[in-house]
């Protein structure tokens, strides 16, 4: 998904001398078993890993508001779970705290169906502490995907703020 690659590149550009080694990477074959993410996780053995992806923004007319996943314009989506992963609770709480401490618009994401590379990265080297930040997107997997510019900005800001405050001393063990 191109918008997540844009967010990753922009976050990398904005980072100024982080305290830890950070690897930025993009994967392929998510839709056929998370193969790229699993291979990447084995090669890098990250600790922790934060995946970037898009997620469903289904805040459209006629849709039951109680079944909304995310809303356009409500900020970055911090993933709690999808069908491939339950994110590390210490990591997603830290990402949420960073958002709150920096007044970054955010919403929580629970995706009832569909998975992401987060699961492949988490399982690649045992139980790698994994979290994810998603860009709320309408019309996923179509040529007319739509995102809100403020959500994309929030994803970039949140990723940068999270990485800038990672010092290697956070305990993500369960």
Describe each model-derived feature in a short phrase.
Residues 1-32, 158-159:
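Alpha-helical metal-binding/catalytic segments enriched in His/Glu/Asp
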Residues 10-16, 42-44, 122-127:
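Alpha-helix C-terminal capping segments
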Residues 26-32, 54-56, 137-139:
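Acidic, glycine-rich active-site loops and adjacent beta-strand->loop/helix elements
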Residues 29-36, 99:
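Glycine-rich phosphate- or other oxyanion-binding loops that anchor nucleotides, phosphorylated ligands
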Residues 34-38, 59-64, 119-120, 143-144:
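Short, well-ordered secondary-structure micro-motifs
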Residues 40-60:
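A glycine-rich helix N-cap at a beta->alpha junction
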Residues 46, 51, 63-76:
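Active-site loop ensemble at the mouth of alpha/beta enzyme cores that anchors a bound cofactor
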Residues 71-156, 162-174:
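Active-site-adjacent substrate-binding region
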């Amino acid at each position: 998904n191109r918008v997540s690659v844009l967010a990753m590149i922009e976050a990398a550009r904005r980072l100024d001398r982080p305290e830890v080694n950070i690897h930025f990477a993009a994967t392929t074959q998510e839709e056929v078993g998370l193969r790229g993410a699993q291979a990447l996780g084995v090669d890098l053995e990250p600790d922790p890993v934060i995946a970037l992806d898009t997620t469903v923004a289904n805040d459209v007319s006629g849709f039951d508001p109680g079944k909304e996943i995310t809303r356009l314009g409500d900020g970055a989506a911090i993933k709690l779970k999808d069908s491939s992963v339950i994110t590390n609770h210490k990591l997603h709480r830290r990402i949420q705290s960073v958002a709150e401490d920096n007044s970054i618009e955010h919403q929580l994401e629970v995706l009832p169906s569909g998975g992401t590379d987060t699961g492949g990265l988490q399982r690649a080297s045992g139980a790698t502490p994994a979290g994810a930040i998603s860009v709320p997107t309408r019309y996923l997997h179509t040529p007319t995907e739509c995102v809100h510019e403020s959500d994309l900005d929030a994803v970039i800001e949140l990723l940068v703020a999270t990485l800038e405050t990672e010092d290697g001393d956070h305990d993500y063990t369960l």
